[in-house]
Amino acid sequence: MLFHVRMDVNIPDDMPVEVADEIKAREKAYSQALQKSGKWPHIWRLVGEYANYSIFDVESNAELHGILTGLPLFSYMKIEVTPLCRHPSSIRDDES
């Protein structure tokens, strides 16, 4: 199952820099492991925003929920999820 996910990050201004840096380091490691596994095949930064558009390729809604709630920055995110399916006019043979 493919999902388009927008993640907007809002780290509190009063969070100590060391704490924010540690959370961001864990977030990077977690997201890169998911990218290497193929569960998170695409991620794009939104210019001028602390946000991204991502594509997730997972087995179920529950799996996606577990991945998203496992993000170290989850508590500081607004997340919008849109399920995707192949368009009948697509010229691609795969989901990439």
Swiss-Prot record:
Q: Could you mention a single GO BP entry for this protein?
A: beta-ketoadipate pathway
This protein's record includes keyword Isomerase? yes
Q: Which reaction does it catalyse?
A: (S)-muconolactone = (4,5-dihydro-5-oxofuran-2-yl)-acetate
Q: Which Pfam families match?
A: MIase
Query: Which InterPro entries has this protein been placed in?
Result: Dimeric_a/b-barrel (IPR011008), MLI_dom (IPR026029), Muconolactone_d_Isoase (IPR003464)
- Determine if Transferase is one of this entry's keywords: no
Enzyme Commission (EC) number: 5.3.3.4
Q: Which family does it belong to?
A: Belongs to the muconolactone Delta-isomerase family.
How it assembles, according to the record, is: Homodecamer.
The name under which this protein is listed is Muconolactone Delta-isomerase 1
